Amino acid sequence: LVSFGGKRFMTLTTVVLDRDGVINRDSPAFIKSAAEWHALPGALEAIARLKHAGLRVVVASNQSGLGRGLFEYDALLAMHDKMTRQIGDLGVALDGIFFCPHTAEANCACRKPATGLLDDIMGRWHLGPAECVMIGDSPTDIEAAHAAGIASIGVRSGKFIDTEDKRWTDVPIVDDLSAAVDRL
C-alpha cells in the first residue's frame, strides 16, 4: 500500500499524462502540426523510466484546435505518430492516446476538467482510481483528476507557474515530467 498526495494506492499501475506542456512544448497559438511538436527536455526519457518500471502510460489531452478548425485530424495523427516514434526510439511504447476534440463551449463530457477521458481510460483497463495518477500542467488536469478520484501531480513546464492555485494543497507541483516521475 502506497500513500501519495493524500491518495492511497493499492497498486499504482497507470500514469495518465497530459500532452501539451507535459510531454511537449505548448503554445498559446496551439500545436498544429508535427513540425511544431517538440518534446520537452527529458520528457521522453521520463516516459521510458515509467515503462521500464512496469507501469502503463496513457496520454489524455484536450485538443480543441480540432474543434476550432485550426488543424485537421490527419495533422493530429501526424503529431501523435511523431511522438510515438520518438518514444519508440527509446525502446518503449505508450499504452494509449485519448483526446477530446471539442471546444469548451461544446460542454462535452470528455474535455478536461470533465472526467470523460479518465473514465474511458479506467474503463478500458478495468482500473480503479487508486491505481492511477494524473500528471498535468494545467488546473483543468488537476480538476479532472480530483473529480475522478485520481491522485495528481502538477508540472511547471506548461501552464502552472510559481504562484500555483492554492486549492490543491495535497497536489505536489514540480518542475517537469522527470521530476514528477521522481516523486512516484
What spans do the regions from the language model cover?
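Substrate-recognition element of Asp-dependent hydrolases with the DxDx(T/V) motif
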Residues: 43, 47-80, 94-106, 145
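Structural recognition of alpha->loop->beta junctions
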Residues: 80-99, 164-184
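Conserved Lys-Pro-Asp/Glu-containing loop-to-beta segment of HAD-superfamily phosphomonoesterases
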Residues: 109-142
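Short, Lys/Arg-enriched N-terminal segments with co-localized hydrophobic residues
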Residues: 1-9
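Acidic, Mg2+-coordinating phosphoryl-transfer loop and its flanking beta/alpha structural elements
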Residues: 134-172
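Short, electropositive alpha-helical surface patch
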Residues: 69-84, 109-121
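Active-site neighborhood of HAD-like aspartate-dependent phosphohydrolases
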Residues: 10-58
